[in-house]
Amino acid sequence: MTNKFGITIFICIASFLFSFSQTKKSVSTKKTTENISIDAELNEASWKDAEIATDFVSLEPKNGTPIPEEFKTEVKILYSNDAIYIGAKLYDPNPEKILKELVERDEIGTSDYFGIFINGYNDGQQEFRFFVTAANGQIDTNFTSAEGEDGSWNAIWESNAKITDFGYVVEMKIPYAALRFPEKDKQTWGLNFLEKLEENAKNILGVQLIIKLEPFRNKPEF
């Protein structure tokens, strides 16, 4: 493991994500004009109305197998004029066993975590990867098919994480300034979501999604 969350682990995870499912799922999202507070509460009206992405499957150790209901993951996505928002509920029947070591930025330590890989061109060539641990530690990297993982890349983004009675919640706000995507009104992005459960036999869970952002008029000014 390196301080940048483990380049070797990231590369292995990427190969699993690109191979475990040939059929990509899709989920709709919508634009919000609310002031979304990044507090891991997900209590704004926009979150309550957003579509839930589920159907996570195991990537390790049993690739492609369904996730038990007690460990289900639910993800919602919103976007505004300047950022994309991700809200995730990560269920665990034993929340007291969720690992949440406090470490420096870009270090994982011994923690459960949730992450999103964003491909703004939906072409499989480049991904910006953002991870949040159960202790609200942030890790970000840039991956390209030509160069592999760039652990030195850092972006400015917001996150929060909170342990609950059903598991834990992660909320993220990623400004468009941290991403790359085409300049057009209607956007179609490819996303991979990833969850690591240390206590649950070190399972790695994932789901591939396509999202459409429309209307997406006038490229935001940063």
Regions found by a protein language model. Give the residues of each.
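Bacterial Sec-dependent N-terminal signal peptides
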Residues: 1-25
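Structural preference for beta-rich elements and adjacent junctions enriched in aromatics
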Residues: 20-222
